[in-house]
Amino acid sequence: MVIGLGNEFRRDDGAGPAVVARLRGRVPPGVELVLTDGEPTRLIEAWTGAALAVVVDAVRADQPQPGRMHRFVLDRPLTGTTRTASSHGFGLDDAVRLALTLDRMPGRLVVHAVEAADLSQGQGLTPLVAAAVDDLARAVLSDVRDAGPPA
C-alpha cells in the first residue's frame, strides 16, 4: 500500500498526492494507492492490516533544504528536526502514536518525505519540490517491489 499524504491546495503539501499520481499504472498488481489528508484515524484505517505501508509526505525542517528527500522506517513517532507538514494540526506523528496505542500499525511503515518550501494556500508545487517528485516515486516503487507481492 502507498499512501499519499497531503493537501493539494497548500502548495508543497501536495507532494504526497503528486507522487501517488506518478505511481498510477506503475505499481505491481495488488498494491493499493491511497490519498489522505493525514487525519490520524483515516491514516490508521488505511494501513490497518497492511504488511507494508509506504507513506509519502512533505515535511518542515528546522534548517530546510527544499526538495531534499528523507526515508524513515517507523516503529515509533518521529523526533528531531523534521515534522510533517500537516495543514490542520494533526499528522503522521499523531497517527503513529495512536496506532501504537491501539496496536494497529502496519507490519512495516516506511515514510518517504520531501522538505517543503511553501505550505501556504495555493496550488502547484514549488520548483525544487516538483523536481523531487520523480525521484520520490522511484524510491517508493523500489520499496514496494523489494517487499514482494502483497499478501
Model region roles, listed by residue range:
Residues 1-116, 123-134, 139-151:
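N-terminal catalytic or cofactor-binding beta/alpha core of small enzyme domains
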